Every structure is written in structure tokens, then in C-alpha cells.
């Protein structure tokens, strides 16, 4: 009997070592998205609209802090509160891993609310519409970082593109004989996020949606990102053991439950924007 030609994923997560400290691909890809690609695209948008450059500099700081703090606290509160309640000092040990995208999104929204009140004096939707455009590519880079870490993958599959994550202890426990691959959900999500990014770019650059429909771009972003997340979560392995009881009781895991409010908010924003286009003359 011939086994399917699964893809053996034996990627070293460590890029190099600097002064005894490992520099990992995940951190590089995270930085590539959050510090380089995202801000570069955002700056081009700022120049296109001839906005105050000081606004852009302030936005970068607000978003960076909101992303890191929100993502970390999201992981602490949503996925392992008991552990961090018993070990509060571990909350600050971010280099050991543990960032939640739902928490990061909440952190960004709070940061944008503060930014809109203190810096631009414009509505939070004005800020979010412009920030949502490059965020999809940032999210895709983070998921590719998860791939380099051989983490957050899917259930076993007989499909030929299944990945054998042989560096993952979790995979070896799940598939002891390593005779099956698992869904590379990191790639699935990255592709979905890139599609959302492309759609948001089209809305901004080709349809001038940020100035014509308040809330449309961020609505499309929230709906696209978190609907794809909701669907792909169906084939992911659980991140925490207690999620099994959650699935037994409500049929959904934590990632799916947290995605629902964002999808609903996104749909509402899209409907609101289409029904109430901005009518004033554009400069």
C-alpha cells in the first residue's frame, strides 16, 4: 500500500543566534509585517491623501503598543487565565510565546479610539478605515510565522498537501507513527488574509472607499478576516485542553466564539456604510 505523499515540514524556527539569544523567523516575519510592510503601505496612503505626517508617526506608536499589549492580554484572559493568575510575572514574558489575534484586534481598536481623540480629532471609523487596509498583510505574515514555528496547525488529513510537522511535539503526540499529515491551517489563513488585504487595497485605491463610505473598509476587513478564521477553526486542533469541553457544550471552540462579534460588527458596518455614503465634496 502506497501512502499519500505528505509534505514533511522540518523547518528550523531559529534564523541565527546573536550573543547567545536565538533570533527566530516568527519574530522576523512579525516585524516585517508590523514594522516594515504595514507602515510603508500606510505612509503611501498618508501621502496620497496629503495628511499630516505627524499623524502618521503618532499612529505607528499607538498601533504598535495596542497590538502587542492587546494580543498578549488576549492570550492571558481568553486562553489561560488560571495559569497567569497563579504566575502573574509570566504575563510579561512575551518571548516565550502567547499572542491572541482577537486580543490584538481589540487592542488596536482601543488604541485607534485614543488616537482619534488625542491626535486627529476625527472619528474612529476614519482612522480604522485607513488602518485596516495594510493590516491583512500583517496578519498573513504572523500566520507564516506560526508555520515556521510548526504551531497552530490543523487536524490530521489524508489530503496530499497535509504537512508532517515533525519538529512539533504536539504533532508527534497526535500522529504517533507520523504516517499522516495535518492541515496546514497557517497557510490557509495566510492566503485568506492576503485576499482580504487585496480587497481592502482595491476598495481604497480604486473605489476611494475611505472617503466615500465611512466604515466600509474596516467592515470588509473584520468580516473577511474573522469569517475565514471562524471557518478554518473547524479543522484546527484545540490550543488548550479545556477547549474540548467547550466544543462538547456549545459546538464551537474559543477562536470561533471570539470571532462571531467581529463578523457581526463587520456586517453591520458594511450595511451602514452602503446605506449612508458620504455626500460632501471630496478634495
UniProtKB/Swiss-Prot annotation:
Spans traversing the lipid bilayer: 18-38, 59-79, 91-111, 124-144, 185-205, 213-233, 251-271
Gene Ontology annotations for the cellular component aspect, listed alphabetically: plasma membrane
Broadest EC class assigned to this enzyme: transferase
The keyword Cell membrane belongs to this UniProt entry's keyword annotation: yes
Localization of this protein: Cell inner membrane
Pathways per UniProt: Protein modification; lipoprotein biosynthesis (diacylglyceryl transfer)
Pfam families: LGT
Binding sites annotated in the UniProt record for a 1,2-diacyl-sn-glycero-3-phospho-(1'-sn-glycerol): 143
Topology in membrane: Multi-pass membrane protein
Keywords (A to Z) from UniProt: Cell inner membrane, Cell membrane, Membrane, Transferase, Transmembrane, Transmembrane helix
InterPro entries membership: Lgt
GO molecular function per UniProt: phosphatidylglycerol-prolipoprotein diacylglyceryl transferase activity
One of the GO biological process terms: lipoprotein biosynthetic process
Protein EC: 2.5.1.145
HAMAP family the record matches: Lgt
The family this protein is said to belong to: Belongs to the Lgt family.
Function: Catalyzes the transfer of the diacylglyceryl group from phosphatidylglycerol to the sulfhydryl group of the N-terminal cysteine of a prolipoprotein, the first step in the formation of mature lipoproteins.
Protein name as it appears in the record: Phosphatidylglycerol--prolipoprotein diacylglyceryl transferase
Amino acid at each position: 500500500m502506497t501512502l499519500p505523499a505528505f509534505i514533511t515540514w522540518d523547518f528550523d524556527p531559529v534564523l541565527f543566534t546573536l550573543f547567545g539569544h536565538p533570533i527566530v523567523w516568527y519574530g522576523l516575519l512579525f516585524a516585517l509585517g508590523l514594522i516594515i510592510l504595514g507602515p510603508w503601505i500606510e505612509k503611501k496612503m498618508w501621502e496620497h491623501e496629503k495628511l499630516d505626517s505627524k499623524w502618521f508617526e503618532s499612529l505607528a506608536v499607538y498601533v504598535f503598543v495596542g497590538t502587542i499589549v492587546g494580543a498578549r492580554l488576549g492570550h492571558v484572559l481568553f486562553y489561560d487565565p488560571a495559569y497567569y493568575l497563579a504566575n502573574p510575572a509570566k504575563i510579561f514574558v512575551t518571548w516565550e510565546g502567547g499572542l491572541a489575534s482577537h486580543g490584538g484586534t481589540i487592542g488596536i481598536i482601543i488604541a485607534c479610539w485614543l488616537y482619534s481623540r488625542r491626535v486627529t480629532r476625527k472619528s474612529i471609523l476614519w482612522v480604522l478605515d485607513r488602518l485596516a487596509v495594510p493590516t491583512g498583510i500583517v496578519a498573513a505574515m504572523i500566520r507564516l510565522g506560526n508555520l515556521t514555528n510548526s504551531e497552530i496547525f490543523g487536524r490530521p488529513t489524508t489530503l496530499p498537501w497535509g504537512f508532517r510537522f515533525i519538529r512539533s511535539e504536539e504533532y508527534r503526540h497526535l500522529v504517533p507513527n507520523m504516517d499522516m499529515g495535518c492541515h496546514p491551517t497557517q497557510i490557509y489563513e495566510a492566503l485568506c488574509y492576503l485576499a482580504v488585504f487585496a480587497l481592502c487595497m482595491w476598495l481604497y485605491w480604486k473605489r476611494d472607499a475611505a472617503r466615500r463610505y465611512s466604515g466600509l473598509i474596516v467592515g470588509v476587513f473584520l468580516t473577511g478576516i474573522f469569517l475565514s478564521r471562524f471557518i478554518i477553526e473547524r479543522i484546527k486542533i484545540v490550543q488548550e485542553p479545556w477547549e474540548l469541553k467547550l466544543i462538547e457544550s456549545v459546538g464551537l471552540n474559543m477562536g470561533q466564539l471570539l470571532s462571531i462579534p467581529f463578523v457581526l460588527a463587520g456586517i453591520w458596518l458594511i450595511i451602514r456604510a452602503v446605506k449612508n455614503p458620504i455626500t460632501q465634496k471630496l478634495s
